[in-house]
Amino acid sequence: MKNENIRKVRVNKRDAIDQIRVALWYSHLQHGLDAQLPSEIAKMIEPDKIRVVNGCVTDNDRKWRNYKNGLNVPHPKLIDKAEAVVQGSSLIINHVLWRAMKNSINLNLLLKDGIGKLSWEVQRILYKSSKYNCDRKLVESLSSKKLMQLERLASLDALAALVIFYRMGVEDTSSIVDISRAIYRTLLIICMKKSYSNFSESLILLMHSQVFSLVDPKESILGDSFKEDFLMDLQILMTQFSKMDSEKLITNTWKKDVRISSDFLEKVRFHNLFEELTLMRADTI
């Protein structure tokens, strides 16, 4: 009984990271089920919870409205229920990225257990090449080539890897600049996805408070108006796609879109990032 009480306390406790991961989880379910209202999702995920009392239907609508706003953390059993209906949804809420962003999580533990949960595409970049998997060793640092490879994956897995290496290199100013740039650019590309675009402001605020704030403010890549800067950069990036031939956009895969975005970002000059970088400006291409 005592252990059960402890577990309940942990489930109900939330912070800024929990709020965004739950809201993203809900959004993923919403898109996967093509549902508009919390009550619709409730009926599809928890049909057994629907009750008729005095002629009125109760369907846990309030609980799911709270999930929509990230106000409560769902129980693991409910996450499993949702996964059975919308495959991949549990990967969103339980992603390694959220643990990587929590400074209370031991870095050695992340290196031991977290990286192994990332996709093979990402792990292949992070580990030194070896004939025997049992002898795999992480690279000491991420070269420009590896940073670009991660950026062009533009996934939560790639972002998690970058955050972990950022935490590893907080004492190394030179590597922090490069990794910071890669995190910023990767997050920009990810936020172009429909399921993430509505959370772009929350994600950059979270990245600022949990990751970029680990270094001295003088060494941070973000200025005082970082939120507005990021949203403007995202708008510029989206505008470039709106100028493309609509027929090409329809036939493009996400991988192709990522490469186009990455190429565009590579051409853009940055300022005020260690006196070399700034906001993205399309007129500098």
Where are these regions (language model features)?
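Extended amphipathic alpha-helical coiled-coil/heptad-repeat regions
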Residues: 131-285
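Short juxta-domain linker segments that transition from a proline/glycine-rich
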Residues: 118, 123-137
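Short, charged recognition helix plus adjacent turn
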Residues: 94-122
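DNA major-groove recognition helix of helix-turn-helix/homeodomain DNA-binding modules
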Residues: 74-96
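A short, Lys/Arg-rich alpha-helix, primarily the initiator
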Residues: 1-48
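Recognition helix of helix-turn-helix/homeodomain-like DNA-binding domains
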Residues: 46-80
